């Protein structure tokens, strides 16, 4: 087969995540109280995975994922001794550190049965750095590649390069 293709739509939920948050009195930054929190996470998603083999020795792997991971029931609060209240409500916010879009492009070529060159290009869309989604990291590409040589049944050699798009850093 010269192509293998799989696509999946999904709904995933994780319930009863437990955490403790330290909330600060807005009138006195030395007055800190811990607040217990039990929350859920849910996402809908679509993933498509393909492997294409257009000619002998060449493989091209492609993966695309779209997801929308969100906090549910993420709210808690405390009342301080001076009567001031402080709380957080992140219900509906995007889960930290998880991108909405992932893309993988992985070409490889077997020069001989024992010698293979390969590369990998991975894209991660914007990821949030905090619960309130106020801070984020821009989308980014990670690139790497290498060569693998099976010298004999007892010895294999390989060389890798991270950051292919920045050759001076390999």
Predicted regions: what is each one?
Residues 131-137:
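Short, surface-exposed loop/helix-turn segments at secondary-structure junctions
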Residues 1:
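Basic phosphate/pyrophosphate-binding loop/patch that engages nucleotide-derived ligands
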Residues 44, 101, 137, 141, ...:
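Exposed loop/turn and edge beta-strand positions of beta-sandwich/beta-sheet ligand-binding modules
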Residues 36-38, 133, 163:
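Asparagine-centered polar/low-complexity signal
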Residues 142-146:
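Short glycine-rich, acidic/polar surface loops and turns
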Residues 4-14, 18, 30-127:
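Gram-negative outer-membrane beta-barrel transporters
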Residues 123-130, 148-170:
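C-terminal beta-signal and adjacent terminal beta-strands/loops
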């Amino acid at each position: 087969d010269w192509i293998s293709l799989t696509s999946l739509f999904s709904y995933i939920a994780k319930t009863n995540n437990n955490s403790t948050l330290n909330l600060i009195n807005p009138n006195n930054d030395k007055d800190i109280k811990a607040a217990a929190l039990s929350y859920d996470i849910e996402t809908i998603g679509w993933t498509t995975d393909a492997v294409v083999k257009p000619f002998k020795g060449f493989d091209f792997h492609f993966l695309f994922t779209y997801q929308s991971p969100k906090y549910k029931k993420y709210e808690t609060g405390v009342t301080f001794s001076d009567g001031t209240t402080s709380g957080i409500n992140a219900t509906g916010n995007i889960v930290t550190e998880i991108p909405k879009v992932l893309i993988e492009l992985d070409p490889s070529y077997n020069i001989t049965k024992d010698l293979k060159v390969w590369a990998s290009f991975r894209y991660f869309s914007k990821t949030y750095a905090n619960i309130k989604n106020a801070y984020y990291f821009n989308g980014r590409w990670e690139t790497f590649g290498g060569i693998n040589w099976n010298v004999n049944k007892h010895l294999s050699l390989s060389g890798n390069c991270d950051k292919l798009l920045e050759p001076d850093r390999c």
